[in-house]
């Protein structure tokens, strides 16, 4: 893509509106962003994930298909010689052209909604921010524009799904789970294809060469990505599309398909399935309602686009984030009223903490600190950082509200919600609890990784901030 085609804008201020201040080169802070070199520990982790993550997804899905979602039974069969990985693999449904057609129609439909239907909901929904929005400043000092229309895409998709189930009957509501393992093949094909395309594109025709980072290691470059914001044309942004669509839009449809399968098999839908559908739908709708805010999060602001995001959004997210609903298809559980109420309360309290924490940060950014947090004017620490174009920018780190309790209370709320999904499945099997285990590892790692980047970005200013807010996730604990 030629430079004249790039969608970018240079600002004199930071994302929160502060003004740029020129400094002497000797006094400038180090340039922020991902490191140019990779250590052996990170490289080992990358190779391990490249080899192990696809196997883990297949193992969990096949364990549900052949062992009612038990993890121990297939392992015992393997240990006792009653089965081999080859025999388990052979018993699983294979790729089908019917599933390929379903998935191709699905992805194409989401591309059309993303590219061809400009957002109109922001014109009629008070408080909703959609349409063309600016992203955060990249390490090279660029600010990309995005068409934020995820909520609209989600609503159109689900209205059509409900109309089909109730009136048109073009396809069965169980179409997703009925083709679940063949669809796993299809999502893997797309995940590897888009990751490989992004890898090659970074070498041949990067969107913004200033934001590309080559570590010198092919495995790390492929896994973690080279381009920061790869695009095709002016508006098709790989990060925004593949993270939100087709994965997260599909999340609630997959859960609805699970519920329909429960109804088909047993003649009823359990309260546990309803809880999982409702709590996860709240999270999904929240994501799309706040999609403009998502443009300022770590996925967009720090992560380059590689296999980690490309394959992860196509395969890992839709198959492993929905494990609770899949488990309940094979193991229908009717929870007691106190148990169901406890799960609901935990999930809603977790969502409240997650949402209010993010709202406080967004409000603080939009008003440049001229607002009220918990009835008081927020306190903050002013920081500075340097982008690759040499400009010095100001930023403010809030130390009030939930952000004064711990540095990542939004993650704390997220983990509470994740635990609620798992507790809805009872305690007979480990598999539905994989999600809380994974999310704990992911978010703790993100805490450490994000803070390492912030330390590099802000230097001594970050030390002042961590002295003011001592804990990461849990006050007085961690």
From Swiss-Prot:
Enzyme Commission code(s) on record: 1.3.1.21
Matches recorded under Pfam families: ERG4_ERG24
GO terms of biological process kind: cholesterol biosynthetic process
Domain of life: Eukaryota
Binding site for NADP(+): 361, 365, 398, 403, 410-411, 450, 454-458, 465
Compartment(s) where it occurs, according to its Swiss-Prot or TrEMBL record: Endoplasmic reticulum membrane
Pathway(s) of this molecule: Steroid biosynthesis; cholesterol biosynthesis
InterPro entries, per the entry: ERG24_DHCR-like, Sterol_reductase_CS
Key words of the record: Cholesterol biosynthesis, Cholesterol metabolism, Endoplasmic reticulum, Lipid biosynthesis, Lipid metabolism, Membrane, NADP, Oxidoreductase, Steroid biosynthesis, Steroid metabolism, Sterol biosynthesis, Sterol metabolism, Transmembrane, Transmembrane helix
Name used for this protein in its record: 7-dehydrocholesterol reductase
